[in-house]
Amino acid sequence: TGTTSSDWADVSNWSTGAIPTSSDIVAIDGTFTNEPSISSTDAVAKTVIVTTGNTLTIDETSSLTVSGDFTNTGTVTLNSTADDYSSLIVTGTASGDIVYNRYVNVYDDTLGGGWDLVCSPVGMSIADFITANGSNIQVLDDDYAFSQFNNATGQWERYATAEQTGNFEAGKGYSMATTGGSTVAFTGAMQTADQSINIINNNGLNGVGRRWNLVSNPFPSYINGNAAAGTNNFMDANSAV
């Protein structure tokens, strides 16, 4: 009900008088004094439903894990800073768009640095991304400070400020820098299924080819890299590759 505040972890904000558990169905539906926000906590639920006109915010350093399905026709926003990120894990199916505000480093004109390696955690077109975030992305000559790596040439290829086509590829990494150290918004449907990333080997006979591929996390959540406690962590799952 949001009677006291927007704090998900405050029992007085819930109609049941209890903080949701992994067995609960959470419906954010109706008119509330305060819309819910998950802040500095790891929230759980069995099912989450956010209806039209309602919002749910997951702040940096916070997470929401849904063991069942996630349905959104309202507005669900995940935030981040330079050092901290939010996480949304859905074990079942997910429907509706989410917004992930991803912090990206400021371009350093003196050193040519400040680039971050990023991946879209949602399905989104390049054109829509540039339209929504173009004013935040650094421009270098006639190109954005937003590029993909071409391992056939061993070069980074920047996106031009002219109109772009195509979509972000799930699991493919990109490099990016912003004008002032700010967030860029990725808006679209989140991935929930396992993703297989094609690794391209361009190691040509003349020695100028490249084998490097920039593989990135395609989910709005954390992936265990090589944690011993992580079930099917990334390194173990790909040990035969």
Where are these regions (language model features)?
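N-terminal exported-region signature
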Residues: 3-19, 23-38, 44, 49-241
